[in-house]
Structures are given as C-alpha cells and as structure tokens.
C-alpha cells in the first residue's frame, strides 16, 4: 500500500538537492551519518519526466536531515526505522523496514534515525524536465 509521506518527499529532495561526488556514486555535502548512493539512472519514457533515479539513503543512529522535497519519489524501507516529520502538513510518520510509501514535492521534512541500528531505504525519483 502506497502512502503519501514526508519521508518520500524528503528523500526525493535529498536525491536531487545534492550532487553525486564524481566517480563515487555517493552524494556530497550531506550531514554526518547520512549517505546517499546512486544505484542507477534510467531515461524516462513518460512525457514530462527527464529521467528516473534509483538510490539508497542510509541514516546512522542519531543522524538527521531537514530538506524540502523537490520531486516525487517511491520508497521502500529495507533496514531499521525512520522518523519523518512533515513540517508542511504537521504530521509525523514512523517508517519501518518492509514498508512502502511515496512523497509529495514541496513539503519541508526532517528525517531522523532515533534507533540503535542504521536506517536504509531504496527509492525511485522521477526527475521532471525543465
């Protein structure tokens, strides 16, 4: 079941907001304890969408990130739990391994790992043509 979530928005935003460090597949300029890995990039066959990015984000215990989601994403938790505070809607979500959700562009969110194990999730982001 897909659910609208700040987390998905945050991840999509994070994926686009930070450029991958050349030759590494990892994003640069992220807070300590947060990594973003580019797993694949696909050309889009959907009108108005330039490409689809497939990425993995990891937050170590105690790590957090605040951002505004720039594009829609589809996510699936693969490890640990993630707290998502959607400052735009005023809602808080807990995302667990095995859950799936989507994000809403334009929402400001804070992603936090308050657990004792790493949180990881995979996500696809639709990058709209400019």
Model-derived segments and spans:
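Sec/Tat signal peptide C-region and signal peptidase I cleavage site
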Residues: 21-27
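N-terminal secretory signal peptides that target proteins for export/translocation
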Residues: 1-3
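Ligand-binding loop in jelly-roll beta-barrel domains
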Residues: 106-130
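Short acidic-glycine-tyrosine-enriched beta hairpin
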Residues: 59-60, 88-107
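A short glycine-rich, His/Asp/Glu-containing loop-to-beta-strand
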Residues: 31-66, 72, 125-126
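Bacterial N-terminal signal peptides
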Residues: 6-21
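Glycine- and acidic-residue-biased ligand/ion/polar-headgroup-sensing regions
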Residues: 70-89
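Short beta-strand segments in beta-sandwich/barrel cores
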Residues: 64-65, 81-85, 100
């Amino acid at each position: 079941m897909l659910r609208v979530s700040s987390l998905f928005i945050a991840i999509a935003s994070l994926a686009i907001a930070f450029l991958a460090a050349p030759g590494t597949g990892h994003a640069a300029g992220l807070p300590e304890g947060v990594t973003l890995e580019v797993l694949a990039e696909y050309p889009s066959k959907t009108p108005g969408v330039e490409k689809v990015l497939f990425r993995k984000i990891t937050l170590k215990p105690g790590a957090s990130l605040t951002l505004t989601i720039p594009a829609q994403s589809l996510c699936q938790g693969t490890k640990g739990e993630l707290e998502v505070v959607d400052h735009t809607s005023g809602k808080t979500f807990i995302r667990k391994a095995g859950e799936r959700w989507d994000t809403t562009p334009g929402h400001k969110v804070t992603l936090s790992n308050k657990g004792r194990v790493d949180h990881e999730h995979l996500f696809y982001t639709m990058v709209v043509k400019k």
